[in-house]
Design a protein with these regions (language model features):
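Hydrophobic alpha-helical transmembrane segments in multi-pass membrane proteins
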Residues: 1-164, 181
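Membrane-interfacial interhelical loops
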Residues: 158-166, 184-193
């Protein structure tokens, strides 16, 4: 889920940047919708390349719902989008409801959307602007860890003791180095020999 989300975000941002470079596309075209469509195509390609296992399908559906919401001018990250993704996943695979993967991914996503929605709507600046990227990683890791801990304990009789620390180290690395390098490699692959 994280990889697909990061890939979609990188492609969305790159497409918006490319469209902003020319005055016609910057002002006359629906650049947000076009960028969301490009990100959806990239996510679809990632789904095809990854083999389309259940976890990747679930991440793709959640990502596709968010990107389609952007294409039609709606808020991409909302509890409604999470609910729509859940309905689609359960329609395609009803047995997923009892699996730890479904429960943990939707618990984490619901908690993250709720917490960041509350923070977005909160009046005033609690966190200084320059610290927000770091705070977002810490908050995301903590919220996801707390949301999934009871489910992990119920299914596996254990909780991840070092999950917060591991995420604090791996998420920035994935977002800044690995995913952009993978996108660049995929774009340049037809050119190379």
């Amino acid at each position: 889920g994280l990889h697909m989300g990061l890939l979609s975000a990188v492609v969305f941002g790159a497409a918006r940047l490319i469209l902003a470079l020319h005055p016609v596309s910057a002002t006359g075209w629906p650049s947000r919708s076009i960028a969301a469509a490009a990100a959806l195509i990239a996510a679809t390609g990632y789904l095809a390349l990854s083999g389309g296992n259940v976890a990747t399908e679930r991440a793709y559906i959640m990502c596709a719902v968010a990107l389609c919401a952007l294409m039609i001018g709606r808020r991409a990250i909302s509890l409604r989008a999470v609910a729509v993704a859940g309905i689609i996943v359960l329609t395609l695979r009803p047995e997923a409801l009892m699996g730890p993967g479904f429960q943990m991914s939707f618990a984490a996503t619901t908690a993250l959307v709720a917490v960041f929605g509350w923070m977005r709507d909160f009046e005033g600046e609690v966190i200084p602007k320059r610290l927000r990227p770091v705070a977002a990683i810490v908050i995301s890791s903590a919220v996801a860890g707390f949301a999934t801990a009871p489910i992990s304990a119920a299914h596996f009789n254990t909780v991840a003791h070092y999950g917060l620390v591991a995420n604090l180290l791996s998420v920035p690395l994935m977002g800044v180095l690995v995913i952009p390098a993978a996108v660049l490699a995929a774009i340049l692959a037809p050119i190379g020999g």
